Each structure stands twice: as C-alpha cells, then as structure tokens.
C-alpha cells in the first residue's frame, strides 16, 4: 500500500509538537514551582521582606512560601546556626519530601561569619548538617543576589538527573567540638556524637587541685556578692 504524504499537515505538526524526555519534563515542572521554607535566625532574613514587595516580586518565579516543611521542596537558611538549633534544622530538612534543595544565604550560614573564630556555640557552616546546593555569600546578601541564587538553582535543576542526585547525597554526617566534618555509622541527627567529644589541644586546661585551692580561698560573702 502506497503511503500518502500530507505536506501541509507535516509542516504544521513540526511547528506545534514539542518532543522531550520524561526527566526534562519533571525538571521543568519542579524548577517552575519551587515552594520555599524560610528558615531565618538572624539579620539576613530581613532581606526577604524586599523580595515579597512589588519591586522584585519573587512570585513570578513560581515561589510560594510555605510554613510546613512537608509542603516545601526548598529551604533557605539565613543567619547564624547554633549548636542548639542544629537538631531542629536537621529535623526540618528530613521532613521535606524528595526532591529537596538547600540555599545557604549569608556568611554566617556558610562559614559561621564573624562568630567563626571565638564562638563556642556556632556551627561553622550549615553544610556540616545538611547538603547545600547553592551558596549565597554576603553580609547580608541583597535581594538581587537572592534572585540570582534562585536562578542558578533553577538552571541546576534543569540539568540534573533525579536518580543520580539521590545516589550522590551523603546520608551519614557528623561534626565534633572542633568543627571537623566526619562520616560516621549512624545517621546524623544534628547532635554531637558522644564518642567523638574531646578537648582540643589548643585549649588550656585548669588543673583540678588549682581549682579546688582557689575555691576554698573564696569566702561565702564574696560568693554572694
């Protein structure tokens, strides 16, 4: 049977049909409707107030802020992350459905910022707790920089393969008192591993006998005052 050609129909079909893969279609749907969970602990979070306004209007990127981690696929960490807040941050991240993404916003979130040298309670980088997709430096970053970070994340999502992303993620994370990143057996929960707690060699120790000698020399009246 001879095939019948329809030149006009063939030209119309070529101009109106888009061919793609299922992976590209999934990436396009995810990058066009990111629902962020705003996690702010310091001054960097104030910059989000400008994004909501009409001048920047981040709704045009499909961003719909959510108050529940179970409805979000993007978390923006802004501000200082302390040791006490680390378990809560990890818990929020684990409650987010896959696939999920993280933007670290500000110097304090990325490296600890000005608290990274002499603070005993600051996490030196949120990537010791959860995997980070985009680092956004600044103190604080401007709204234009936040939009640029979201644009770069959208480009990253458009080129990724979901199965490869799941295989490349690290599941076991831990950090010690001197903020060294280590891999451990158990899944990281944001708490310190008790087996890894030790006193850094650079910290000076007070002998026990000196402490009790000083304590006995102080009168009760001085302690009250």
Swiss-Prot record:
Cellular component annotations (GO), alphabetically ordered: chloroplast thylakoid membrane; respiratory chain complex I
Pfam families assigned: Oxidored_q6 (PF01058)
Keyword Plastid: yes
One GO term of the biological process aspect: photosynthesis, light reaction
The keyword Iron-sulfur is assigned to this record: yes
Listed cofactors: [4Fe-4S] cluster
NCBIfam families: nuoB_fam, PRK06411.1
Known role: NDH shuttles electrons from NAD(P)H:plastoquinone, via FMN and iron-sulfur (Fe-S) centers, to quinones in the photosynthetic chain and possibly in a chloroplast respiratory chain. The immediate electron acceptor for the enzyme in this species is believed to be plastoquinone. Couples the redox reaction to proton translocation, and thus conserves the redox energy in a proton gradient.
Identification of the protein by name: NAD(P)H-quinone oxidoreductase subunit K, chloroplastic
This protein's encoding gene: ndhK
